[in-house]
Every structure is written in structure tokens, then in C-alpha cells.
């Protein structure tokens, strides 16, 4: 079986995230989405717009998503998430799906052995941006 991993803050979730999940699901049999903690969002952009429980529940309700996991890597990577998925599905092929804004030069997760990495999932460019949505909302 092929297990596909997506990760992100999803704060707020938008159409680009849905395209990411849809495309990622096509890569395998099971889609696992890691939702970053509020602490991670605070480090990245000062505070969450939506709290973790809201983001988790919304992601969990999306039809392409089979499992949702929480995670908080102190190094701002998704390496801990990947390790947890590898432990949960030790016999299966693991694919880490990267969105359009990621590549090999800005992907610390590529250090993890035994994982296939897919880039440009959901499109080769970023369709939408949570930060841009919030910026326009604040203005």
C-alpha cells in the first residue's frame, strides 16, 4: 500500500490546500495529513488565526483525507510527522507530498531515508496563500 503524507498549518484553509490534498490522494492509497500545532504557527507568524482544534476538524472532514495527525517539530520541519507515519505503517511505501512552493533546496524532510518525495503536488506554483488571505483581511 502507498501512504501519502501532506503537512502544513492550514491557517486558514483555502482552495489551494484542497487542490494539494486532491492531488496528493491520487499518488497513493491512503492520505495522512499532518496539522501543525498552534505553537508552530506562533513561531512562524506570531499567532494562529484559527486554533488547532478548528483546523484539525476541518482537515479531518475533507473527503480526500483518510487520517489526520497533529505534530510540532521544534525545528520547523515535518520529520517527526514522517517518522510517526513510518512507525504506523512500517510495511508500506511512504510518499511525502510537497506543495508548489517547495523544492529540494528548502526541504529538510528530504534527509529522511526510506521515503519517496513528490514535488509540485497540487500545481507547480502556490495557488493561494494563507498569509496573503489574512493580509488582505486585515486591510
What are these regions (language model features)?
Residues 1-139:
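Nucleotidyltransferase catalytic core that binds NTPs
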Amino acid at each position: 500500500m502507498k501512504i501519502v503524507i501532506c503537512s502544513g498549518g492550514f491557517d486558514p484553509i483555502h482552495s489551494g490546500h484542497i487542490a494539494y490534498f486532491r492531488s496528493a490522494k491520487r499518488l497513493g492509497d491512503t492520505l495522512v495529513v499532518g496539522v501543525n500545532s498552534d505553537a508552530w504557527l506562533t513561531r512562524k507568524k506570531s499567532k494562529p488565526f484559527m486554533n488547532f482544534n478548528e483546523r484539525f476538524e476541518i482537515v479531518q472532514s475533507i473527503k480526500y483525507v483518510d487520517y489526520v495527525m497533529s505534530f510540532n517539530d521544534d525545528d520547523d520541519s515535518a520529520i517527526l510527522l514522517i517518522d510517526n507515519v513510518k512507525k504506523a505503517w512500517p510495511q508500506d511505501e511512504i510518499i511525502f507530498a510537497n506543495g508548489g512552493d517547495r523544492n529540494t533546496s528548502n526541504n529538510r524532510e528530504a534527509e529522511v531515508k526510506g521515503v519517496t518525495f513528490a514535488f509540485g503536488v497540487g500545481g507547480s506554483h502556490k495557488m493561494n496563500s494563507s498569509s496573503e488571505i489574512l493580509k488582505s483581511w486585515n486591510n
